[in-house]
């Protein structure tokens, strides 16, 4: 496939000669100091923002496979968007083992057409943010498909527009991010990431962010308690890195400030927020034109 005049490549195959202003390619994660006040804030927020773990059920079970791709789909009323269908079709056509975690108000609202796309399908209730879906998926895989490599992403992105099937297996890291930032602290951005060899021990090491007994129900808490801490917690027991890193002193968010350059470099996603709360970062008409050029139905 060709994107913007270049051949689209899996992220693990992007040539090291690619240069994007303000971004570092193939970045190894390292912890930065955590001030005492932030540690206190983390504890206080966990107590203040915790909610019960979401209700869930297995619709189509996980079975033993070498690798899984997890797609978290939020559809409270059970209606799939054109963007959802585009993503699901790309995953089906790529031949991956796809686990869909679908959030609706009740199990009966899970769209029946998901069965045609998903090798495994879980329903999740409205409680909890996206990390509660990740937790559910990873726990099921650790039990039913122990040792599998797992790529996870959510529906905050358009795409994928290039091959993501080997992003985890060919990565040099155990925990792989697509992009990383130093906003708040060095962290992997959680819209998409991969974990090698997911098993019970791995989940135990990651329990400080993939909460086994509760969830959080708002964006700020999910960012501060889970996204920002995920790479730090993971680095205690595994190698961690990202394909692209942006220092917050140079740019706020790689996916918002350099989206078109990333796409030209073979990056598989565009953030949906470029047409929403982050629309001030890029011209919306250009975003739509790029999506149209990529064959996306919007």
Predicted regions and their residues:
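ER/Golgi luminal nucleotide-sugar-dependent glycosyltransferases, focusing on the catalytic module
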Residues: 2-298
